[in-house]
């Protein structure tokens, strides 16, 4: 999403406020693909669900807000209710409902046994 920004100073922020144990998260990205983010409560350990990281269980119910600051007077802001708690599915839903753009988003995280991230990626 950040790579879709046109100007070097454009910024994208995604905020999720949720009822799950992580409490929410914030991610920012620029047009060059630089991304940083944090979760409100990082020390949450959930058991795997079907052998995979249980992102939906960590988030629970909530709201996702996408803010695009393109240097205009006011930033563009779109908001959707989390549908599944799986971030890729919720971003796909956001694109369809808020921006009316048919899209598919895929994300993956490979975890180490000590609950640290080994690698992550997406499209």
Predicted segments, located by residue:
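Interaction interfaces in information-processing and related assembly proteins
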Residues: 1-123
């Amino acid at each position: 999403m950040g790579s879709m920004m046109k100007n070097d100073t454009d910024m994208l922020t995604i905020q999720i406020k949720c009822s799950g144990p992580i409490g929410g998260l914030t991610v920012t990205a620029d047009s060059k693909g630089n991304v940083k983010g944090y979760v409100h409560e990082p020390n949450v350990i959930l058991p795997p669900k079907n052998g995979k990281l249980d992102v939906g269980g960590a988030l629970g119910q909530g709201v996702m807000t996408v803010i695009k600051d393109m240097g205009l007077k006011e930033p563009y802001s779109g908001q959707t209710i989390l549908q599944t708690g799986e971030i890729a599915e919720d971003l796909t839903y956001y694109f369809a409902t808020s921006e009316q753009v048919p899209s598919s988003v895929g994300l993956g995280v490979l975890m180490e046994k000590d609950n640290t991230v080994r690698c992550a990626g997406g499209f």
